[in-house]
Regions:
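Folded extracytoplasmic luminal domains of secretory or organellar precursors
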Residues: 2-5, 13-178
């Protein structure tokens, strides 16, 4: 039952932002096909290599993407580390303390940057990695449309609505219905 619940909530976390966005914004698939044609392939290869080393990586990346999307949308702010400015990052939030996978995304980003410097956003790399992780875990493969004009918010967001990693399915169901 836990596995089914986890898969359902993972699918909702990944697909809901895309469905909601599609209703209000212009989406463009294949955004990087001319700017960095190898971007998605680089992400695929890097995620595949990470999965060979650790079969738990797909779940970690899907959860990381979920936490990034849940509060205010897909912006990769969950990957930011706290700096000396004393403005805490999302990684310092209690809800995000146990997240695994940022190191994998950092490595993927470095590989993409080596091929196409300053071109592919961290948010898109995380989205591609979550999609590829979903597929590697036995889920579907889907296209990632890109939306320009995302708003970026730095610092710890309100996690009063975010599900805890130890929440029961019934609790998560209530949170998703809010």
């Amino acid at each position: 039952m836990f596995l089914i619940c986890s898969l359902v909530f993972s699918a909702v976390a990944i697909l809901a932002p895309l469905v909601i966005s599609a209703a209000h914004l212009h989406l463009e698939e294949g955004f990087y096909s001319e700017l960095c044609p190898s971007a998605e392939h680089i992400v695929w290869k890097a995620v595949s290599a990470a999965v060979r080393k650790d079969p738990n990586i797909p779940a970690a990346i899907i959860r990381l993407y979920f936490h990034d999307c849940f509060v205010r949308g897909r912006d990769a702010s969950v990957l930011l580390k706290t700096t000396s400015s004393k403005n805490p990052s999302e990684q310092d939030s209690v809800a995000n303390k146990g997240l695994k996978g940022p190191d994998v995304i950092d490595k993927v980003k470095a590989k993409v940057e080596a091929e196409c410097p300053g071109t592919v956003s961290c948010a898109d790399i995380l989205a591609f990695a979550a999609r590829d992780s979903t597929y590697k875990a036995g889920g579907i493969y889907y296209n990632i449309p890109r939306v320009s004009g995302w708003n970026y918010f730095l610092g710890i967001r309100s996690y009063t609505i975010s599900p805890s990693p130890i929440s029961r399915c019934s609790t998560n169901y209530t949170i998703f219905n809010q």
